[in-house]
Amino acid sequence: MRTAATLLRVGSVLIGMILMASQAQARQWPGGRQAAVVLTYDDALPSDLNIAIPALDAAGLKGTFFLIGNALVPEQIERWRAAAAEGHELGNHTVRHACPQANYPPARKLDTSEAYDVPMMLAEIRTMNTMLTAIDGKLQHSFATPCGEHLAGGVDYLPVLRVSGLVRYTRSAGWPGGKVLDPMDVPCRWFDEKATGSDMIAAVESARRSGGLLVVGFHGVGGDYLKVSAEAHAQLVAYLKAHADTLWVAPFSTVMDYVASHPENQDGPS
């Protein structure tokens, strides 16, 4: 378990929203919708199974769940399999979620990113892919970098991951340096635990006005750690359902597949 001090250090790394916007006239989304919204959930948490997925299912929406291998427990496997069968995406969040040492108690050494090298990280991503395939039957998966960073032993592993063919797309953190959206380093804007439904809806509206893409990231929903309240999550989901005629809500890989096939949607943040 992370300590309170650790939670404060990672703060904004737990409830994230990714906002990518360019000029509205340059964007085209399915059905003439004005923006695309992706809902993602990290760490294979019980509250995602118990609260988030039922809320999404009730609204007819599909999300992406980035699972950590060592967080999976046998009694939950069938529930994750059922979620995938219902159209939710299962994504790769590595086996051990190696983050920088600064995010963990001093005694935790073995599964920090400093203790890894690039081959070790790619081997772990490959292993997690196999675990996911055993659950959902799919041969390709997207990836979310642990703690929003992509370092192993101080070396950026994205260049090697990019050419490895192991994952289709990567959700990271921070703004990219270029003007074109990089599907292997999708940028992120993070919000803290106090984010409300109104905060999230305002971000959606900003994306809609600019014709952009908003990727929303959660950890706990109404429980677990670094959580957003179930009420705030429900408000966002209700808003997305009510505006389905103007907002396209789909899993991460589905939206990124669309972006990849529509060059006019590949502009980076404005």
Each language-model region and where it sits:
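Catalytic domains of cell-wall/extracellular-matrix polysaccharide-remodeling enzymes
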Residues: 51, 73-75, 102-201, 232
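N-terminal secretory signal peptides that target proteins for export/translocation
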Residues: 1-6
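Short, histidine-centered active-site or binding-site loop motifs used for metal coordination
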Residues: 94-96, 109, 218-222
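C-terminal domain-boundary segment and adjacent tail
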Residues: 27-31, 60-63, 71-75, 133, ...
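Bacterial N-terminal signal peptides
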Residues: 9-19
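Membrane-interface motif at the C-terminal end of an N-terminal transmembrane signal
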Residues: 20-25
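Active-site beta->alpha N-cap acidic-glycine motif
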Residues: 26-101, 124-150, 205, 246, ...
